[in-house]
């Protein structure tokens, strides 16, 4: 089976925070899981290096947009690598090949009469002497009455036009813009209404509820044609006569990246990329809820406009992460920055918390106290404790060698069942449930260790003791295998310590007589005082 997994492309206009990672982590879990199952996987993403957020930051810092994009693209790559993201290709939207492909697609859509010219009212700032693209405008959302940008409201996720906003202001100088007429290019999104409606009906059990509800809302309102050109000097030039000075709307540019990077990957690796874009391939898209309409409506319409009938099979769209009960605010430094966190904490501790408490169905909160409790409780107290006390026992009483033992039927059946249950949970995007299923098993094996009292039977019945430890070691190697999609770093350590090189999504066997490698503590205890230190940094 060919499985394509696309992770949303973060704007390269500032450091990643935990909200970004929480939305994107499910993609890595799925990629690792499907590879272990032996499926043919292509997992891609990249940095969104165009658009107004980058232009605004560059203007504020008196540098070029290219410098800003370069700085944060490098930082993103480093952070994703440190966090264990296993992208097959991580690209960028200012890549030359991507630019050529996007321009080719725009031309093709124009030739196919899915793009047309239209005179529209636009906002113009007399003080700045320029037309204002969407993100250069701020105002009040007409739907929920909160402060919003000119392209979308972060609170209610409504896609907006700058003219929709009340009490509009120029983001650059703060003055009130005036309305002027100008020509723009529009994509005939309305032409795809019926096709997208039919696909929504087919996706009722495959997309997350927020994706279904959000997409259904737009379809009920009736799809509106969307402007794809912007009055900017940073971005991909429109390849149509009379519009060469305008740039491609950043969200058209970004979602087409899934397609263009697949082609580039195929060319560079001499691989058949088109198998991942056939109707038979399975597509997963991983992103936050604010990105839903771009993936559920705009991207499939663009693909159909150039002859690809592939539709999104699974949309794994996360709700938001709050921080200490409040909305994340990058401007007020009410955020946990990923570059800082990966320098201070175990990456598997970060991954575990964000996956075990992920915003799958509703907003979730990141609390420093809960993060420390999570590390010290589940990871250290349950998982790490099982591994450490079993390994220490083997070293002390069995010369660091896996003893002879008979696998107990109950443990074997529970393990086989776990692979099936966890696999189903992952494939449906229920990662919180998948992790809980594994940790229930961990707790049951800890209970088994306690009830079998090997510290007593080592002196009274060595065969019973050997059997207990053998079953614990069998459980540990399979737990590590099951947790590999979630916690790849700690799983790799355990497999190395136990001399295991298998990576399939099947029950692993355990051979007696193998010597354990040098091992150490899997997870360190975190001092609760760290929570106070981290809290003191917020909002400063």
Curated annotation (Swiss-Prot):
Enzyme Commission number(s): 6.1.1.10
> Which family would the database say this protein is a member of?
Belongs to the class-I aminoacyl-tRNA synthetase family. MetG type 1 subfamily.
UniProt cofactor(s): Zn(2+)
Q: Kindly indicate whether the keyword Glycoprotein belongs to this entry.
A: no
> In its keyword annotation, does this UniProt entry include ATP-binding?
yes
The EC class name is ligase
Q: Where is this motif: 'KMSKS' region?
A: 327-331
InterPro entries named among the record's database cross-references: aa-tRNA-synth_I_CS, Anticodon_Met, Met-tRNA_ligase_1, Met-tRNA_synth, Methionyl/Leucyl_tRNA_Synth, MetRS_core, MetRS_Zn, Rossmann-like_a/b/a_fold
Record's protein name: Methionine--tRNA ligase 1
- Could you cite one Gene Ontology molecular function of this protein? metal ion binding
Q: Which PANTHER family match?
A: METHIONINE--TRNA LIGASE, METHIONINE--TRNA LIGASE, CYTOPLASMIC
Sorted alphabetically, the keyword list is: Aminoacyl-tRNA synthetase, ATP-binding, Cytoplasm, Ligase, Metal-binding, Nucleotide-binding, Protein biosynthesis, Zinc
What domain of life does the UniProt record list for this protein's source?
A: Bacteria
What is catalyzed by this enzyme?
tRNA(Met) + L-methionine + ATP = L-methionyl-tRNA(Met) + AMP + diphosphate
């Amino acid at each position: 089976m060919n499985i394509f997994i696309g992770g949303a492309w973060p704007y390269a206009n500032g450091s990643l925070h935990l909200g970004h990672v929480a939305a994107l982590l499910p993609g890595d879990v799925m990629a690792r899981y499907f590879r272990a199952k032996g499926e043919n996987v292509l997992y891609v993403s990249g940095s969104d290096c165009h658009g107004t957020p980058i232009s605004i930051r560059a203007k504020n810092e008196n540098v070029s947009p290219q410098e800003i994009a370069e700085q944060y693209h490098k930082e993103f790559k480093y952070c994703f690598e440190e966090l264990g993201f296993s992208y097959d290709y991580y690209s960028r939207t200012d890549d030359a090949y991507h630019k050529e492909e996007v321009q080719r697609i725009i031309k093709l859509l124009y030739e196919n009469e899915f793009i047309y010219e239209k005179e529209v009212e636009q906002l113009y700032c007399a003080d700045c002497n320029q037309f204002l693209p969407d993100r250069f405008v701020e105002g009040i959302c007409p739907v929920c009455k909160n402060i919003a940008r000119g392209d979308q409201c972060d609170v209610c996720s409504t896609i907006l036009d700058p003219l929709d906003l009340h009490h509009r202001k120029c983001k650059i100088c703060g003055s009130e813009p005036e309305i002027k007429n100008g020509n723009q290019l529009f994509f005939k999104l309305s032409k795809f209404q019926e096709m997208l409606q039919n696909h929504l009906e087919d996706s009722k059990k495959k997309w997350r509820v927020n994706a279904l509800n959000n997409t259904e809302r737009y379809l009920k309102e009736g799809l509106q044609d969307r402007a794809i050109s912007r009055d900017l000097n940073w971005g991909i030039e429109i390849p149509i006569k009379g519009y060469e000075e305008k740039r491609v709307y950043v969200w058209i540019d970004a979602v087409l990246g899934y397609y263009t990077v697949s082609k580039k990957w195929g060319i560079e690796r001499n691989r058949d990329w088109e198998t991942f874009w056939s109707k038979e391939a399975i597509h997963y898209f991983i992103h936050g809820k604010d990105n839903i309409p771009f993936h559920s409506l705009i991207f499939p319409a663009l693909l159909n406009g150039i002859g690809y009938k592939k539709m999104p099979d699974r949309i794994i769209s996360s709700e938001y992460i709050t921080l200490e009960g409040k909305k994340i605010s990058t401007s007020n430094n009410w955020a946990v920055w990923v570059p800082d966190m990966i320098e201070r904490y175990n990456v598997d501790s970060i991954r575990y918390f964000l996956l075990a408490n992920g915003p799958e169905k509703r907003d979730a909160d990141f609390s420093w106290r809960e993060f420390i409790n999570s590390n010290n409780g589940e990871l250290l107290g349950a998982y790490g404790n099982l591994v450490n006390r079993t390994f220490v026992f083997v070293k002390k009483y069995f010369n660091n060698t896996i003893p002879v033992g008979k696998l107990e039927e109950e443990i074997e059946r529970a393990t086989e069942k776990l692979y099936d249950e966890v696999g189903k949970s992952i494939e449906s995007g229920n990662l919180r449930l998948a992790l809980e299923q594994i940790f229930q098993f961990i707790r049951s094996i800890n209970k088994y260790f306690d009830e079998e009292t090997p510290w007593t039977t080592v002196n009274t019945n060595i065969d019973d003791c050997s059997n207990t430890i053998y079953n614990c070691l069998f459980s540990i190697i399979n737990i590590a295998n099951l947790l590999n999609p979630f916690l790849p770093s700690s799983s790799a350590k355990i497999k190395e310590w136990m001399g295991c090189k298998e990576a399939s999504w099947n029950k692993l066997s355990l051979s007696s007589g193998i010597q354990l490698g040098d091992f150490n503590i899997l997870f360190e205890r975190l001092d609760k005082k760290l929570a106070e230190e981290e809290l003191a940094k917020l909002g400063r």
